Amino acid sequence: MGSWYSGNAADDGANTRGWILGHFLDPSAGERSTKDLEVKWGIHPAGEQRAEWVTGDQRTTLVLLVQGHFHVKFHEGDATLTKQGDYLVWGPGTDHSWQAEDDSVIITVRWPSLPH
């Protein structure tokens, strides 16, 4: 593999829960194997949720709505993504949970890419 790659996010993320870049990819994945960031193509059917809170995560996160209606809960309040291009950013240590209100496609970017 050279210094560039072309693929399909749904296909490439099929065996990694949608994650297409990150430290967890084998180095044979070339440029997609990186400790700098993680990128996920998330397809979430209506009603899917992470009921348990994500706590203590030490990465910065960007969530970008491609389509759908997506709700994120924080201890300090809630945010809803409803319009294509709506996004949220939160810093390390921000606890959260989420729910797809409608069928939703989300791009998630986290940095740096850290083992759990």
Task: Name each model-derived stretch.
Residues 1-46, 51-53:
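A short, N-terminal "cap"/entry segment at the start of jelly-roll beta-barrel domains
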Residues 44, 55-72:
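Short, conserved beta-strand element in jelly-roll/cupin
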Residues 51-52, 72-73, 90, 95-101:
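Short beta-strand His + acidic residue motifs that chelate non-heme Fe in jelly-roll/DSBH
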Residues 76-93:
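Short acidic-glycine-tyrosine-enriched beta hairpin
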Residues 58, 78, 94, 102-103:
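A generic "binding-loop/recognition-motif" signal
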Residues 41-42, 87-89, 102-116:
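A short hydrophobic beta-strand segment most commonly corresponding to one strand
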